[in-house]
C-alpha cells in the first residue's frame, strides 16, 4: 500500500486500528493526537525476522497482512522436500534454493505493498551495525545457540544506548511459546536457560548390554554398530557385507538423509530388538530417522498460533496501543487449547544481563522524584542517558527509542512512590554501565 494511503478511516482495512488509537482506554490513557501518523510510523518500522522455516513463514505472512511494509528476513538454510508440508511459501520448484530468498519473493508477489529484503547466511556473520538498523526483531528459530547469540548481541547493543525489543517464538509439536525481551530491562533468554528440557541421551552401558526400548536398539545401531562396521570400511566392504546398495561417495560417514543408510539402521535395530525380545513393530524408516536426526514433529497449527502471538506483540510494541506481553506465554495444544502467561524474573547473576546492586533509603512521605534518583546515580556511575524500569520489567523511563522516550518521560517528574512502592527494585541501564544497576528502594 502506498505510504500516503496507509489510513483512510472508514474505508481502509486498518480503520479499526485508527479508531482504537483515537479512543483512550484503561491501557491507552493518552490517545495519540494523530493516530494516522502513529499507525503510519509503526507500519513503516524496519523489522527483522530471523528464521524462514515453519514459524518464520507464518510470521512473515502475518506481518505483511497486518500492514508492515519494511521487512527483512535472514536464514542460513536451503529448502528441502520435507519442508513443503508446513512451510507454505515454498513449493517443489524451490528445492535447494535459499529459504530467505524464496520467502521474500513469495510475500512480495502476493502482497506487493510489502518490501521484504532477504539475507542468506548466518546471523553471526552480520555486524552490530546491521542489527542497529531495526526497530524490532522477531525470532522464529529452532536453535538454542542462535537464540543465545542474538540475545547477547541485543543486550550488548542496549548497553550502548540503542534499545531493540526482541520477540521470540518457538514451537515443538503441539507446544509453543512466545516471549517479549526488552534487553537489559526484562529477563533475557540467558536468564531462563535452566528451563530448557535436556536432550534425551542413554547411557552407553545400557545400549551395549541391557537395551529395554526400541529407541535403545536404534541408538545402539547408530552410535555403536555403524562406527564398528564402517568407520574405516571401504565402499566395497559395505556392498559385500550387506544386501543394500553401496554407499554413495568415497567414505562411509553416516548420512541421515541417505535412505540406504537409514535402511541399514532399520535392519540392525530390528535384529537387536528381536535378540532382546523387545517389540520391533514401531521400528521403521520414519522412526529411525526421527531418532538419529533428533526430529520433533512440526505442527502447522502450532506455528500459526505462536506466529499470531508474536505479531500481535509487534503491533502493541510499535503502536503503543496496549501493554505488551509481560513477558512469557506458553501454549499447550495436546488436550485442547491451553495458554498461560507469567513473568520470567530477571536473574541478578545472569552472565549476559546481570546487575550491579545499590540501596536507596526513602521515607514513606518522601517527594523524591524518579529524576532525582537518576541524577543521584548519574554522578556516582557517570551515567549519560539512563533508562529505568522495575525488576518485574515495568518500564518507568526509557531513553530510547524516541517513541518510548516520549511515552515514559512524564514519569521523570513524578514522586517515585506515586509510580512504584518501597521495597521495589529499580533496574537502571546506561551505555556507561558494564551491566545493569539494581537499586532497592528501602523504607527508612
UniProtKB/Swiss-Prot annotation:
This is NEDD8-activating enzyme E1 catalytic subunit. ATP binds at residues 54-78. Heterodimer of uba3 and ula1. Interacts with NEDD8 and ubc12. Interacts with but1 and but2. Belongs to the ubiquitin-activating E1 family. UBA3 subfamily. GO terms for molecular function: ATP binding; ATP hydrolysis activity; NEDD8 activating enzyme activity. PROSITE patterns: UBIQUITIN_ACTIVAT_2. Pathway: Protein modification; protein neddylation. Catalytic subunit of the dimeric uba3-ula1 E1 enzyme. E1 activates NEDD8/ubl1 by first adenylating its C-terminal glycine residue with ATP, thereafter linking this residue to the side chain of the catalytic cysteine, yielding a NEDD8-uba3 thioester and free AMP. E1 finally transfers NEDD8 to the catalytic cysteine of ubc12. GO terms for cellular component: cytoplasm; cytosol; nucleus. The gene is uba3. It comes from the Eukaryota.
